[in-house]
Regions:
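Catalytic active-site module of serine/aspartate enzymes centered on a nucleophile-bearing elbow/loop
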Residues: 350-352, 360-382
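Short beta-strand element of the alpha/beta-hydrolase
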Residues: 85-94
Length: 382
């Protein structure tokens, strides 16, 4: 049972109080639901990003719908002083983050390098709509990328034959899945990728402490019996969740820097240093919230619906970027082996951890590599 709770908390909520996972008070749930609902489509016009605004690009807030009727909020970045139709890139992630954090930084930086870019909040999170709030869905979150392609392809200054996508962390997996489904996507990149369906079903397939080289040794994932117990736990909680319209939430994660101890896994401490400090905190991000986390039934689909089942059929050019010392490195290594694209590359950033690629605090995001990749497949070869 200990591993089950580890999987359940570190993947979706990282909740510090196991018993409260299925026993949030009704008042807390109602307040959280009301607050998120009222603010779901209030688009903040002021610059509230964790990174400075570039003078090299134009920025606009935009909205668009996916095929489920959910309205997504996004930031559109366009390089200044350009003419004609340009290549475009849709960006999202990390899992539990918002467009004002990592995805916006990636989007703005790539716009400085000549692309029209779109950083969007996934369905049910941030400024995007969707009820109940904070509900992950492998299908809908994959669809969000295709909806972003729809939007970009409708713009007069975008060549719809030159659209790519980029997913960060958990949205790296969803980006690969979107490229498998959507043949309009001409290039797919990932940064510090997670496969959220795999980690939800199997837990972390690593030892929780790095080895002497600073990397993480592999271990077997969850057994079918362990997954069965997880599903029983969540489905028992679902009775109460159904009474509240599925708007009951896991407690806030345990990323408060004050709770980090020497016994805390190193990568959890790194998450805390990003999401709960001035460095990367944003009030709309699930992972930054001190009040509540994901919807408590949200993990069910992630456990049961693997996203990369047909990875061998992928033909889209792919670039998978990961840190050498990231606990999550095995996701990119395995995905690289699985995907069938003849034009694929696994690029390992020396000495970088998972969170090093969330922002450029350590100067380790290989923007030159991303630029080279997207220009090759969206500009030079078109």
């Amino acid at each position: 049972m200990k591993k089950i709770f580890l999987t359940f908390t570190t993947v979706l909520a990282m909740a510090s109080c196991q018993n409260k996972q299925v026993n949030n008070t009704e008042n807390t749930q109602t307040e959280a639901q009301s607050s998120n609902t009222e603010n779901a489509m209030t688009l903040t016009q002021e610059w509230d990003k964790i990174f400075p605004k570039s003078e090299k690009v134009d920025h606009h807030k935009v909205t668009f719908k996916n095929r489920y009727g959910i309205t997504l909020a996004a930031d559109l970045y366009t390089p200044k002083n350009t003419q004609g139709k340009l290549a475009a890139i849709a960006v999202s992630g990390p899992f539990g983050a918002v467009k004002e954090q990592s995805s916006g930084l990636y989007a703005q930086t790539l716009a400085e390098r000549g692309f029209v870019t779109l950083a969007f909040d996934p369905s049910f999170t941030g400024e995007s709509s969707g009820e109940p709030r904070n509900m992950p869905s492998p299908e809908i979150n994959t669809e969000d990328f295709s909806a972003a392609v729809d939007f970009l392809g409708s713009l007069e200054n975008v060549d719809r034959e030159r659209i790519g996508i980029l997913g960060i962390c958990g949205y790296g997996g969803f980006a690969l899945n979107a490229a498998l489904s959507d043949t309009r996507i001409k290039a797919v990149g990932t940064s510090t990728m997670y496969d959220m369906t795999r980690v939800s079903a199997n837990g972390y397939e690593i030892k929780m402490t790095p080895n002497a080289q600073g990397t993480y040794d592999r271990v077997p994932g969850n057994t079918p019996e362990a997954r069965r117990k997880m599903k029983e736990q969540m489905n028992n909680a679902r009775w109460e969740s159904a009474k509240k319209g599925y708007a009951s939430y896991l407690p806030a994660n345990n990323l408060d820097p004050k709770t980090i101890t020497p016994e805390t896994p190193k990568f959890i401490a790194e998450y805390a240093d990003f999401y709960r400090t001035k460095r990367g905190f944003h009030s709309r991000a699930v992972n930054s919230s001190p009040e509540h986390s994901w919807a408590d039934t949200g993990m069910l689909a992630l456990i049961n619906m693997p996203i990369l089942h047909y990875a061998a059929e992928m033909q889209t050019p792919a670039l998978l970027v990961h840190g050498e010392k990231a606990h999550s490195r095995y996701f990119s290594e395995d995905a690289y082996k699985q995907i069938g694209s003849k034009d694929k590359e696994l690029y390992i950033v020396p000495n970088a951890t998972h969170v090093d690629l969330y922002d450029n605090k350590a100067g380790k995001i290989p923007f030159d590599k991303f630029e080279e990749f997207y220009k090759k497949w969206l500009v030079v070869n078109k």
